[in-house]
Amino acid sequence: MSLTKFIVPAMAAMAITACGSKTAQETADDFDYTVDRFADIEVLRYKVPDFENLTPQQRILIYYLTEAAITGRDILWDQNGKYNLAIRDLIENVYTNFDGDRESDEFKGLELYLKQIEFANGIHHHYSMDKFTPVFSREFLADRAAKLPADRQPEDLETLLTVIFDPTVMPKRVNQAEGQDLILTSANNLYENISQPEVENYYNALKDTTDATPVSWGLNARLTKQDGKVVE
């Protein structure tokens, strides 16, 4: 199995700040590039030379840009799948409120699943587009969800459990198999109850074939049907 590597620049910046008092040779020798390893993923960080020479205002700007990226990430989660945000909330709440044996196979499986979905921005692998297969049981998650505080209870637990554990439900975030309807068979949240021909016909009707610099249609938009009519 191939190992995917991911770079985390913001974490590197913090590491460099913490190592500012060391010599360059000590910093080079001591720097640990690996943040974490799980499943087929290796999370990396790297050095940011001269970060410590930035002005306070420049560092504050980087901080707020990072915060903006984190905040905007929820848009990507939602676009990647209809139930992604609700599933993330469920798994995070079970993880943080867990009061049992954190060395148990069930909990370790939950922790692995949490890392996978956090890395992929959803319940599908970022490269293969296949839905993650949990290595903890449906019964375990249902039991732990039932013990959450009232304000942490999911609205529709059974639906979330089905999406997580049923391999036939939303198996691919983006399906590119030849001969299949790529819209109906993909789990992303940009289309709902609509087919590939309907999507193509909708956008083809909007195109101005005489425009030498045409606009791009469908960016960050969602197509669905209302009263049998395709709407954006």
Labelled PLM ranges:
Residues 20-22:
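Bacterial signal peptide processing site
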Residues 29-232:
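N-terminal helix-rich structural modules
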Residues 15-18:
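C-terminal motif of bacterial Sec signal peptides marking the signal peptidase cleavage site
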Residues 1-8:
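Bacterial N-terminal signal peptides that target proteins for export
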